[in-house]
Amino acid sequence: MKVIFSIVVFSVLILLFRHKRIETKIVINQPIDHVWQVFKCKSSHPKWNTLFGIDRFPTHVGQQISVDLYNENRNVQFSMQPVIKKLDKYHLEWEGKLYINGLFNGKHQFIFTKIDDNTTQLVQAEDFNGLLVPILNYFVIQPTKFNFDRMNKSFKKYTEDQTLNNDNCKVPR
């Protein structure tokens, strides 16, 4: 009877807590066009991106890209191939999954908002869904929020110190 009760309780918990959203925000003291150009400049990513590496910056919705997630030493911890769900000016969103759909899915968002002519807000968020969310919350989801904050701070510092003037990544100033 205890085993059946435990299975029922565990099943109910999985059904109730299979969604989790994390969100971080940072204000960057640069115009939004400059911030967006730095973000899109793939060749600058190794200088500031402590969270992931991408094979190329996406160009259209529906495109599949390769993303390598880093650990704190910037070694590849996990690779995935998410699909671009939204790509507008100042907004990038992709969706990926762990092995099969519904097990552990994530929708990652980068949203840049103009505060004033010289200030931009970056919101980085992830919506996790799936059966493994309750189990992976402590070991994966909570450390991910910490890593978002770390990447945001690194991106802010790099962007505020950077004047883009090379051929690959130009920003009119």
Located regions from the model:
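Hydrophobic pocket/interface hotspot
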Residues: 34-39, 45, 65-67, 84, ...
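A conserved amphipathic terminal alpha-helix motif
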Residues: 2, 121, 126-173
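Hydrophobic ligand-binding cavity/cleft-lining segments
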Residues: 2-60
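Short C-terminal domain-edge/linker segments immediately following a structured domain
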Residues: 55-58, 66-70, 97-100, 113-116, ...
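Short, aromatic- and cysteine-enriched interfacial helices/patches
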Residues: 16-17, 51, 103, 133-135, ...
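Short beta-edge strand/loop motif at the mouth of beta-sheet-based domains
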Residues: 43-79, 85-89, 172
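Hydrophobic-ligand binding "helix-grip"
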Residues: 2-6, 15-17, 47, 73-119, ...
